C-alpha cells in the first residue's frame, strides 16, 4: 500500500485550494488536494509540509485532520491521509500541476476528481455542513 498525505488548504475567507494534475502525470488533468508519497524516514505531517513546498512553493501549518481514505486503483492501492491546513507563507508557483483554484466548499463536487480524493471531498463537505448547522439560528 502506498501512503500519501494531502492538504486541504483553507484560506482566510474559507476557500479551499485544489490543484489539477498535469497532462504528463498519472491520472492526467484530474483535480486533487496537493500532497505526495510519504518517505520511509518521515511522518505524514513532515511529508505534507515538504511536498507542498516542493510542488507549490508555499509554507503551510497543519490545523486538523480527516479520516484516511483507502482506494484501489487498477495498478496500486493508495492510503490517502488528509490534513486541514492554512497557508503561512510564500506565493503559489506551480511546479508539477497544470492549474490551481481557490473554491468555495459548495463548488468542490463540480470538479473531475482523482478517485482517491473523492472520499476526502465527501468527508470534508459533511464536516462543513455539520459546522454550519451547529452555528445556525
Predicted regions: what is each one?
Residues 44, 48-52, 65, 83, ...:
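Hydrophobic packing within well-folded, soluble alpha/beta domains
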Residues 1-16, 37:
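Conserved N-terminal beta-strand and adjoining loop/helix that marks the start
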Residues 55-62:
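Short secondary-structure junctions
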Residues 1, 30, 74-79, 94:
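A generic structural micro-feature
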Residues 93-137:
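Nudix hydrolase/Nudix homology domain
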Residues 11, 59, 68-91, 99-101, ...:
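Active-site-adjacent beta-strand/loop module that shapes the phosphate/pyrophosphate-binding cleft
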Amino acid at each position: 500500500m502506498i501512503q500519501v498525505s494531502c492538504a486541504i488548504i483553507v484560506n482566510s475567507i474559507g476557500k479551499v485550494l485544489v490543484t489539477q494534475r498535469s497532462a504528463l502525470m498519472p491520472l492526467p488533468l484530474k483535480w486533487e488536494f496537493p500532497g505526495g508519497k510519504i518517505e520511509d524516514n518521515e511522518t505524514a505531517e513532515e511529508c505534507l509540509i515538504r511536498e507542498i513546498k516542493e510542488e507549490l512553493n508555499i509554507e503551510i501549518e497543519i490545523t486538523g485532520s480527516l479520516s484516511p481514505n483507502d482506494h484501489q486503483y487498477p495498478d496500486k492501492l493508495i492510503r490517502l491521509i488528509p490534513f486541514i491546513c492554512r497557508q503561512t507563507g510564500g506565493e503559489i508557483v506551480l511546479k508539477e500541476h497544470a492549474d490551481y483554484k481557490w473554491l468555495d466548499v459548495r463548488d468542490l463536487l463540480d470538479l473531475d476528481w482523482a478517485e482517491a480524493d473523492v472520499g476526502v471531498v465527501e468527508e470534508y463537505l459533511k464536516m462543513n455542513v455539520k459546522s454550519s448547522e451547529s452555528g445556525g439560528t
